[in-house]
C-alpha cells in the first residue's frame, strides 16, 4: 500500500455524497419487502388449500371403496412430491431474499475508512548482506588478474558504508500522508529546480555556439592576396580617445589588380513604329509605343490586318 494518500481518499466528504445511491437502495429495499409480503401471503393461501384438500380427502375416503383408496394414495403421494418441490423452491427464494437484504444493509452502512497508522505502514525492503569470502575465489599468478581482483575487493569495501547510508536515509524518511498545502509547496520547489536547470542548459548552449563560431573563424583558410584592417581605441592622458586605421597604400598590388568601376549607361527605349522615345507600353504585346497612332498600328498588326513581306522586310 502506498504511503502517500491519494487525492480522492484525502479530501473531505461532501454533504450530499451518496444521496442518489441511498435513494436507489431504499427503493430496492421497499421492493424486496413487498416481494417478501407477497411470498408469505402465497404461503398462507397454500396452507389453507392444503387443509381444505385434506378434509375433502377424509370425506371421500369414508365413502369410496378400496380401489378408490388406492387411487387416492397415489394422488396423495404425487401431491406430497409436488409439496416437497414447492417447499424447496420457497426455501431457495427465501435464501435469495435474505442475501439481497444483507447486501442492501451492508451497502447502506457508511464505509469504514482505514486508520492513518495502518495506511502509513509501508513494508520495509529486506536487504540481503553479501559476504565475500576471499578464500573461496580462484587465485591466479598473473599480475593483471591479481590487480583486478584487488580493485574489485576495494570497490566492494568502499560500497558498504555508502549502502548503509542510503538504507538509513530511506529509513529516516518521514512517514505519513502529505496534505494539499504540502503538495503545492513540493510542486513549487520542483518548478524552481526545473527553471534553474533550464537556464543552465540555455547558458551552456550559448557558450557552445560561441565556442564553435570562434573555432570556425580561427581555422578558416583565406586565399591571398589578403588585406587586414585592425581598429582599436587608445586612451590618452587628457581623456580623449583616438582610433588608428591601417589603409593600404596605392602601391599595393591589390589596388592595381581591381578593374575600374563602370557606371551603367541608361538607354532610352524607342517606339517600334515611329522610332521616337517610348512613353507607353502595350499591355497585350508588351511593345513600347510613343502615341495613340502607334498603338492603333500595333493592334492592327496584332489582329493580322497587314501581311508581312519577306522581300521588303516590313508589313504592307
Swiss-Prot record:
Compositionally biased tracts (Polar residues): 167-180
Biased composition (Acidic residues): 40-56
Phosphoserine carried by residues: 64-65
Main location: nucleus
SS bond list: none
GO biological process: chromatin remodeling; transcription initiation-coupled chromatin remodeling
Database matches in SMART domains: YL1_C
GO MF entries: ATP hydrolysis activity
Coiled-coil regions listed in the entry: 20-95
Region (Disordered): 1-81, 93-127, 153-180
InterPro entries: Vps72/YL1_C, YL1_N
UniProt keywords, alphabetically: Chromatin regulator, Coiled coil, Nucleus, Phosphoprotein
Domain of life, source organism: Eukaryota
An example Gene Ontology CC term for this record: nucleus
Residue ranges, compositional bias (Basic and acidic residues): 20-31, 70-81
Subunit field text: Component of the SWR1 chromatin-remodeling complex.
Described purpose of this protein according to its UniProt entry: Participates in the catalytic exchange of histone H2A for the H2A variant pht1, an euchromatin-specific factor, leading to chromatin remodeling and changes in transcription of targeted genes.
Family note: Belongs to the VPS72/YL1 family.
Name the UniProt record assigns to this protein: SWR complex protein 2
Amino acid at each position: 500500500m502506498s504511503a502517500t494518500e491519494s487525492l480522492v481518499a484525502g479530501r473531505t466528504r461532501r454533504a450530499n455524497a451518496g444521496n442518489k445511491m441511498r435513494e436507489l437502495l431504499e427503493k430496492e429495499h421497499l421492493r424486496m419487502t413487498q416481494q417478501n409480503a407477497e411470498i408469505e401471503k402465497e404461503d398462507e393461501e397454500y396452507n389453507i388449500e392444503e387443509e381444505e384438500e385434506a378434509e375433502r380427502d377424509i370425506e371421500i375416503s369414508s365413502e369410496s371403496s378400496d380401489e378408490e383408496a388406492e387411487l387416492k394414495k397415489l394422488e396423495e403421494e404425487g401431491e406430497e412430491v409436488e409439496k416437497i418441490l414447492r417447499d424447496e423452491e420457497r426455501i431457495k427464494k427465501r435464501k435469495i431474499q435474505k442475501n439481497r437484504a444483507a447486501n442492501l444493509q451492508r451497502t447502506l452502512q457508511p464505509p469504514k475508512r482505514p486508520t492513518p497508522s495502518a495506511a502509513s505502514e509501508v513494508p520495509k525492503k529486506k536487504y540481503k548482506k553479501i559476504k565475500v569470502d576471499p578464500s573461496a575465489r580462484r587465485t591466479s599468478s598473473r599480475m593483471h588478474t591479481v590487480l583486478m581482483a584487488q580493485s574489485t575487493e576495494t570497490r566492494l569495501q568502499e560500497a558498504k558504508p555508502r549502502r548503509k547510508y542510503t538504507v538509513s536515509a530511506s529509513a529516516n524518511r518521514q512517514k505519513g500522508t502529505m496534505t494539499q498545502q504540502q503538495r503545492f509547496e513540493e510542486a513549487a520547489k520542483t518548478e524552481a529546480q526545473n527553471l534553474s536547470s533550464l537556464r543552465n542548459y540555455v547558458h551552456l548552449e550559448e557558450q557552445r555556439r560561441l565556442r564553435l563560431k570562434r573555432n570556425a573563424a580561427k581555422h578558416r583558410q583565406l586565399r591571398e592576396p589578403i588585406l587586414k584592417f585592425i581598429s582599436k581605441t587608445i586612451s590618452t592622458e587628457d581623456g580623449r580617445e583616438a582610433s588608428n586605421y591601417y589603409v593600404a597604400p596605392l602601391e599595393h598590388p591589390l589596388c592595381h589588380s581591381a578593374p575600374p568601376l563602370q557606371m551603367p549607361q541608361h538607354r532610352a527605349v524607342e517606339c517600334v513604329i515611329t522610332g521616337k522615345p517610348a512613353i507607353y507600353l502595350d499591355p497585350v504585346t508588351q511593345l513600347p509605343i510613343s502615341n495613340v497612332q502607334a498603338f492603333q498600328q500595333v493592334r492592327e498588326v496584332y489582329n493580322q490586318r497587314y501581311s508581312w513581306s519577306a522581300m521588303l522586310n516590313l508589313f504592307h
